């Protein structure tokens, strides 16, 4: 039962009780109450000539006395109970003298027929509880149908897929709203063209792909691309989330898959879009419990519908996932998902186009340069950029500004990349520790060859960090050398080295730095073959989660001796980074103190101010950072700039 329906019933019941209370309490009681007495008491009052009138109703006698008479006394008090009207029951033995006594004492005698309930009324009394139960049940069913909508309701609606159908008029998103995904748009436009004009392809013997799988990290625009296809295609577009197939009853998932494809076939040519495919498409044969069996039944039905005995060339299936590694191999074979369209993070040119799309409805000032913003946000995907524009607009609205300026975008970027500024009260000693910690990161980042340029360093608490040193590469990186990675590790440990040099002890502020350095060293040794002792090997160590659909338990594909070697090599890499950080800090202690003093005074330093401080101490810095090589994309944006938290 829905909450609104329940409240309606409570209100109606409360109104009925209120009306009954008003009628019973506020209505004046003018009639004398009737008191039940014994037949002997009735005869006694009759003998005393105190009965004025009586009425016979079957075996019952109701009468009035001439004078009020005491009924009884309350023990222990002076209070008495009296009555004027009475009621009694005739005995089963006939009293032959009663009528003579009544006539002799001139008692007004009336006779009424005994009232018997109507058969219909009796039937209604017995049926009323059942009618109430049926009525409540009907309200419950109606409420569930209203709440769940099409495909919901009770038993009959569980087999409905619940997919929403979009037409060109209903979907307002087109490819013009999708920027930076030219390759993916080209792949999908070919499919849309096939549905619009199939003869163009069929005359050459070409067949449309049965399925298209959109693969990419979260936030890169996979679902947005599907919305654009719905807006561009001149055919019905059915959309559903894969999690909607699974229900509390066994067999519902397979039934909903059949219903979805039946609706698509009735409206062919059409497109089906299944979002988050990994919810039902995980590899079969693993997992425990009935829920896993239900998911496998749903997956089997999906496989059969996509490429079974019945052909459906005019129904194309699209899907999106960010976990293609856990999908069942049968889903990815030709004939089902023929094409896998990779939706990657955009480069700076694509980011500029995405910013243009998201700023269409935002009044921006003339000083806003979207190209500068795009270049200063490496690694950001479409969702991140949309959030960046929204944050800038919120900041401008908070300041009652008429337009969004470049300063608002800078504040929004700091909020997104470094976290929300916190009003945390810190002691002077803790501020000094934070300042030297961030100065250590900054000094390592500015003096280490090949390091990413400093964008901003702050000792204002943001997010969960007490201070942040932000580095941004000049351009997007797709290839990382060993020397660059070693520099990243050294920069991560620069804050810890500064604390040791100044305060001669370590603090807990380097917790996140140590984690970053260790994770990076582990990837260098285990995945990228950058260890001479381990060699050119790729070793899965602590990455795979066995319960994601691949295995029932984790196992190591290497010996205990190799595990010991890996630990030694990871420690060696981290120690090398620590040694490099210690050397740079030890050789530039005056510069470190100068940077820390500037941070304590100004709290936030940008790259220009950092370079000014370095020049004041006699260190010449290059304006143009070391160039980095281009090549294959290795880290997929994971190291494309970042913030070192103190």
From Swiss-Prot:
Its cofactor is Zn(2+). Residues 26-120 are periplasmic. This is ATP-dependent zinc metalloprotease FtsH. It is found in: Cell inner membrane. It comes from Syntrophotalea carbinolica (strain DSM 2380 / NBRC 103641 / GraBd1). Zn(2+) binds at residues 437, 441, 513. The keyword Zinc applies. ATP binds at residues 216-223.
């Amino acid at each position: 039962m829905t909450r609104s329906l329940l409240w309606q019933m409570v209100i109606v019941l409360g109104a009925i009780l209120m009306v009954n209370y008003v009628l019973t309490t506020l209505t004046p009681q003018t009639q004398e109450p009737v008191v039940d007495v014994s037949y002997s008491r009735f005869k006694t009052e009759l003998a005393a000539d105190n009965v004025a009138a009586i009425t016979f109703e079957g075996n019952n006698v109701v009468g009035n006395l001439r004078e009020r008479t005491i009924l009884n006394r309350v023990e222990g008090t002076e209070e008495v109970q009296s009555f004027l009207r009475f009621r009694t029951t005739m005995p089963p033995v006939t009293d032959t003298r009663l009528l003579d006594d009544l006539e002799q004492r001139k008692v007004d005698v009336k006779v009424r027929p005994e009232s018997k309930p109507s058969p219909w009324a009796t039937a209604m009394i017995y049926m009323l509880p059942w009618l109430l139960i049926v009525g409540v049940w009907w309200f419950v069913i109606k409420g569930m149908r209203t709440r769940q909508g099409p495909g919901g309701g009770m038993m009959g609606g569980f087999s409905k897929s619940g997919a929403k159908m979009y037409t060109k008029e209903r979907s307002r998103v087109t490819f013009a709203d999708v920027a930076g995904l030219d390759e993916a748009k080209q792949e999908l436009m070919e499919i849309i063209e096939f549905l619009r004009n199939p003869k163009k392809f069929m005359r050459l013997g070409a067949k449309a792909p049965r399925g298209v799988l959109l693969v990419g990290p979260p936030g890169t625009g996979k679902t947005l691309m599907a919305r654009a296809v719905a807006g561009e295609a001149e055919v019905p577009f059915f959309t559903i989330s894969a999690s909607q197939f699974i229900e509390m009853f066994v067999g519902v998932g397979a039934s909903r898959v059949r219903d979805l494809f039946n609706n698509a076939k009735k409206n062919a040519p059409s497109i089906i879009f299944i979002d988050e495919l990994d919810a039902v498409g995980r590899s079969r044969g693993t997992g425990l419990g009935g829920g896993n069996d239900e998911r496998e039944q749903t997956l089997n039905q999906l496989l059969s519908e996509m490429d079974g005995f019945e052909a459906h060339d005019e129904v194309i299936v699209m899907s999106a996932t960010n976990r293609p590694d856990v999908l069942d191999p049968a889903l990815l074979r030709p004939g089902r998902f023929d094409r896998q369209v990779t939706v990657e993070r955009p480069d700076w040119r694509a980011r500029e186009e995405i910013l243009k799309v998201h700023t269409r409805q935002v009044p921006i000032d003339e000083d806003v340069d979207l190209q500068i913003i795009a270049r200063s946000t490496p690694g950001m995907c479409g969702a991140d950029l949309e959030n960046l524009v929204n944050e800038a607009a919120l900041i401008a609205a908070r300041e009652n500004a008429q337009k969004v300026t470049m300063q608002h975008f800078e504040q929004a970027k700091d909020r997104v990349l470094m976290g929300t500024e916190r009003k945390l009260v810190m002691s002077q000693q803790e501020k000094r520790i934070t300042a030297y910690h961030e100065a250590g990161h900054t000094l390592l980042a500015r003096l280490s060859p090949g390091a990413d340029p400093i964008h901003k360093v702050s000792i204002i608490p943001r997010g969960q960090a007490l201070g942040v040193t932000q580095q941004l590469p000049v351009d997007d990186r797709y290839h990382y050398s060993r020397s660059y990675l070693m520099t990243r590790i050294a920069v991560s440990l620069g804050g810890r080295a500064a604390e040791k040099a100044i305060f001669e002890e370590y603090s807990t502020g380097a917790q996140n730095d140590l984690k970053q350095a260790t994770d990076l060293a582990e990837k260098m040794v285990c995945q990228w073959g950058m260890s001479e002792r381990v060699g050119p090997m790729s070793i899965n160590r602590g990455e795979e989660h066995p319960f994601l659909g691949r295995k029932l338990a984790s196992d190591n594909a290497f010996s205990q001796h190799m595990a010991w070697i890996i630990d030694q090599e990871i420690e060696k890499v981290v120690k090398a980074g620590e040694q490099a950080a210690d050397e740079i800090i030890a050789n530039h202690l005056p510069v470190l103190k100068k940077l820390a003093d500037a941070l304590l005074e100004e709290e936030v330093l940008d790259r220009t101010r950092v370079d000014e401080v370095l020049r004041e101490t006699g260190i010449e810095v290059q304006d143009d950072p070391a160039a980095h090589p281009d090549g294959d994309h290795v880290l997929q944006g994971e190291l494309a700039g970042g913030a070192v938290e103190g």
